[in-house]
Amino acid sequence: MPRIRLDNLFGDPFALASVSISLLAWLIAFVSAIISSIRDSFPPIYWWNLVYMFLCIVGIAYVMATATTHIYSTAVVGYVSAGFAFTTFAADGLLKKQSGSNEAAGAGFILLSIVNVVWIFYFGSSPQSRSRHYIDSFAMHKEQPSYLNPSQMSNHYNNRPDTTVSTQPPQMYTSAQLNGFETSSPYGAPPGPSGASGIGNSQVNLAGTSSNGEAPNEVSPPTEYPYKAKAIYAYEANPDDANEISFTKNEILEVSDVSGRWWQAKKATGETGIAPSNYLILL
């Protein structure tokens, strides 16, 4: 489950402003609705509009605080579009009533409608669009996967935690350490340079494996890849890291986990490895 980080919300001027304005507009409509219910008559259906918009505001704040906009953007657009219809309908009905409290509630719904339009535009825009790029450029902690060129992405991801395969140096043996192996073979290898070489290689291989023939630090790859991702840039794997995989632009990959900066991916050819998430976009 994604972690809630308030830095993602307070460090993003757009997120902070839109959520704050929507909360202020909701409070205006809510307080005015209470006053209208006491003094005049407030249509009961509009209470559902207030509850629905409150849930939308909380949900959008959660999405922005967890930096999962790229995952839930489609759902957010759908919910906010329905909320826009609700708030517009409520504003039209309340402004027709000759009452100060109803008109104040209608003003709150109008302000909510304006924020809804802005949210529909933002969450409905592609991450590669210029408008989305411009808005996100003011954020302090937001990752911008589609706005960096490939060279910037490569440098941005060079500081990832090293994996077991890439950090473990090859085990080297000197001739002094291998001395005497030609006389200790249980297989009866012939003495001499050829026999010593064969037994030495056998001992080196056995030294790096466990009793059941598997490497002690080897991590088995996942068997399920529930997500699909599309490469927005071509990527060439680091030759010094056997865990990475190369892929071409627009290539479709299967992904097992979408958390973190590096995703475990599988190509159509069956090749598996890790890929930088900023080069991929979920489908």
From Swiss-Prot:
Residues 149-168, 182-223 are annotated as: Disordered. Keywords: Cell membrane, Membrane, SH3 domain, Stress response, Transmembrane, Transmembrane helix. Residues 224-283 form the SH3 domain. One of its GO terms (cellular component) is plasma membrane. It is found in: Cell membrane. Residues 199-214 have a biased composition (Polar residues). Its main location: membrane. The chain crosses the membrane at residues 15-35, 45-65, 75-95, 104-124. Residues 1-14, 66-74, 125-283 are cytoplasmic. CDD domains: SH3_Sho1p. Gene3D superfamilies: SH3 Domains. Residues 36-44, 96-103 are extracellular. Coiled coil: none annotated. It is a multi-pass membrane protein. Belongs to the SHO1 family. Plasma membrane osmosensor that activates the high osmolarity glycerol (HOG) MAPK signaling pathway in response to high osmolarity. Forms homooligomers. This is High osmolarity signaling protein SHO1. It comes from Uncinocarpus reesii (strain UAMH 1704).
